[in-house]
Amino acid sequence: FEVADAWKKEYRLDERPDLGGVVRSQRADVDLFFLNDGHGHFTRVPISGARFLDESGKPLTAEPDYFTLAARFYDVNGDGAPDLYVCNDFEDPDQFWLNDGQGGFRLVPALAMRETSNACMSVDFADVNRDSHVDVFTTDMLSPTLQTRQRQISTHTPLPKRVGLTSDRAQWMRNALQLARGDGSWAQAADFAGVAATDWSWGSAFVDVDLDGYEDLLVVNGHRWDIRDADGVNRLGSTMSPVPWNREQGEFPRLAARSVALRNAGDVHFTDASKAWSFGVDEAISQGIALADFNGDGALDVLVTRLDAPPVVYRNESGQPRVAVRLRGRSPNTRGIGANVTVKAASLPAQSREMTEGGYYLSGSDAELVFATAADSLVDISVRWRNGQRSELKRVSRNRLYEIDEQGASAAAPAIAATDTATPIFVDATALLGGHVHIDSPFDDFTRQPLLPTRLSQLGPGISWIDVDGDGREDIVVGTGAGGSLAILRNTSGKFVPLRASGAPARWDLTTILPVPAQGGGTTLLAGQSSYEAGSPAEALHVASVLGFPVHASAPGAPVSIAAPESASVGPLALADVNGDGLLDLFVGARVIPGTWPFPAPSHLYLRTSNGNFIPDTANAHTLASLGLLSDATFADLDGDGWPDLIVAAEWGPVRVLHNDHGRFRDITRELGLVGYTSRWNGLTVGDMDGDGRLDIIATSWGLNTPWSASADRPYELVVGNSGSRGPGLVFARNDSASGREMPQEPLPRLGLMLPGLHDRAGSFAAYAKMSVDEVLGSEAKAVGRIGATTFEHTLFLNRGNRFDARALPRAAQIAPAFGVVAADFDGDGREDLFLAQNFSPTETGTMRFDAGAGQLLFGNGDGAFHAATVRESGISILGDGRGAAAADYDGDGRVDLAVAQNGAATTLWHNVRGRQGLRVHLDGLAGNPLGVGAQLRIVSGTRRGPVREVRAGGGYWSMNGAITVLALPPDATALWVRWPLGREQIVPIASGQRDIHVRAAR
């Protein structure tokens, strides 16, 4: 395709792999770049050629002709050179250029910034969480109120999300807060921070309004015409003849809006302080914003320009102590533009700002910086000038304006880019896996159920460490999606050699993979099989729930059916000796009945017999049939009675605990205080996170960086009814804090897919925006059920014996959904740590991807609290959709390594190089349970014992840790405590310098 010659000046073709072809785009004027020679003369330099390079380092062949609204220089990576962010309107992509220090620019790598605003209006920079890294904020036009959103249309084109695609940079109609990770990449955290929606926003500025040491955010809003008004668009669309542009604009209402002040409360959390600070008290069309100290009191005031109205000056009345800084630079840079100023006060985090000129939307601020000092007398100011030299002022007085002259600067100072000096605990060893990539064939979930919030066809894979060939080294086994094959990556002491299962590619997804001893020796791999993509209920009933892959001579044989087909597709599997006969029994968790989400599905327990078969357990069938839609499951002895209890994570329900009384299960969720913590839980594991000898529960959910929010008093609800052939009717609802009514969260066009008469009943988008759930459902309102979530936080449930206490994991861990979760002592300090596998991309088409995670390592403090490791501290960066995660010491060095699977992308391996070496425990169990599944281990040091660890098969989101357990080994360790399934205990002495110990169960 090509544009006809007559139109090439107005239009261009853009290649869009995400749309499977090319699109026509309107051209704007090209952006202009001018170099100052220092003598008052500027020379235009084309934004192409050798000075401007693309992400791969190739020169731009043509100058960008995007609809640019703002451009701003700021040194984002601390190398002393000004980088450049260019804000582009409509669907033109923003351009983020890094300066090479020689005046050349290169676009940031594709994966450095995963999501941006769609119609970017302005940009500003600040270190919002005071971690010494520069964060980036851009504005767009998403309304903060549900009612306004429901009567407007979106400006961005909803794009299909391809399986495994991570390198594209999606654009979404919302503000973006790019939170710097410190490794040259950013995590989009606007929802997480509470800054995603400020209305039709133009200028924005970071400024510490209340002088508490954290920069707050001011955003100005409004537009002459609300051209996103859906009713206006419909009126124009129904007109038979063309409408002149000036009359067309008259179809749209004026959009006057209040400007917004967002107070930075720390920890990447902003709250609306507009009313408290008397900012934006009236509705107007405000576009420009600038900062200056108009009254000389050392606090920055604000000037806002408005369309068709006089400008407004807001006087800052904060009385908190501060210092103001102006710079006198060497000619010709007399204002010291590009210099970085840092203020350190004893009771506040270090504050840094760069002296900049212009760059706001059609605006620029005065060259004065203001910093909080609290009541400290110890205040230092340092300036790193553009040429690298430094000026230092020690123990300055508060409440003063300091003008600092470059003439007194000292020799060149190092760049200020913050670095974590500690060596990362992990290094990337993925290359050892031979390039294994998870395969997941595309499936259109939304044809069958149009109102699904997320795809259910891209939930895998799980990953397990299993010694498949019996050579003493644990191998990696990864599930597959339809069209792929079960992957066995054999550990050959230095690299992993892939072995493929025999037969054709899998017809259905293989979920959890677990080992059981085969009759006559060897291993059988049990694989959960999902029938979710079956074309009909009848077809689903021909899909075996569990397959068995016998392993012969290191190679897997053809699969055989282990468990009969069921109506529900399978997700999690878990193994334990539930009835005390010495054989491992199998729990099969129901994920969903195809086409009926979120209706519950029955799970099942299969007992193993002495001849190696699995038979359905009837004693617990009724109890297991009502557990709901299970995302994950594991067995663990929570009460220390020697019998494995069952813990399950469900969608739209609590984490449930079923107590095992000699093979009979009883749901004790309510008794343990867990019933009120409902969520769309994903993964779960257990670990002794406070070192008290009791296993705690860790459950992953969707985090705090999505459009969803929930609390006990305002749950996020799903109203469910029966809509016939297209599955259950779904209405996502939440109580509106303003009206007190339960309001639908879905836009009218989407909800109308399931309620055909809704358009007629509503009559207009404006009317629909005011309708409650009962009004939307009409006569069907009484024939519905409600399920809900009270939290979306990843949560630690501390075991107190007769109850569990809920504690949200650190806020930094909530920046993305998590699935896989591993509890292990990664640093070897004797305190259990956690790892979370993060991200979820296959949301419904109009919802952004949830991909701000990179895999989160949490170092345990030993009391149930954690330190969230940065990417530099952990060494882990997994930017795709993490699913299963499992730990093992694959190279036998006494450190816990990590394997993480990704949906539709490469399986990753992380080698632990910095943890303290621990004790490797090899259990030799009975014939029916050779790995000792269910055994608990603790290190004994005099009268003290370390955290308890249990050998388990299943959990961690469809996964299994290695059975060779690594325990931290303190210098005074004397013995290993082992409690086998059913409660028999052993104390095994540890010799000085011993690093491996073998414990054999009594025969």
Regions found by a protein language model. Name each.
Residues P46-A62, A110-M113, D191-G194, K275-G280, ...:
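Surface-exposed loop and turn segments in beta-propeller and other repeat-based domains
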Residues L35, T68-V76, L98, C120-R130, ...:
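Beta-propeller blade termini
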Residues F1-Q26, S143-R169, H223-R254, G528-H542, ...:
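Short, conserved, GDST-rich strand-edge loop motifs in beta-rich repeat architectures
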Residues F1, G78-C87, S132-T139, D212-V220, ...:
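Acidic/hydrophobic-patterned starts of short beta strands in beta-sheet-rich repeat architectures
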Residues D29, F67, D92, A119-M121, ...:
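Beta-rich catalytic cores
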Residues S185, F252-G462, F496, L525, ...:
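Gly/Ser/Thr/Pro-enriched helix-cap/hinge segments flanking short amphipathic alpha-helices
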Residues F1-G80, C87-D89, S567-L607, G612-A636, ...:
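Solenoidal tandem-repeat scaffolds enriched in leucines and small polar residues
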Residues K8-Y11, E15, A28-V45, P93-V108, ...:
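Beta-propeller blade repeat segments, especially FG-GAP/WD-type strand-to-loop junctions
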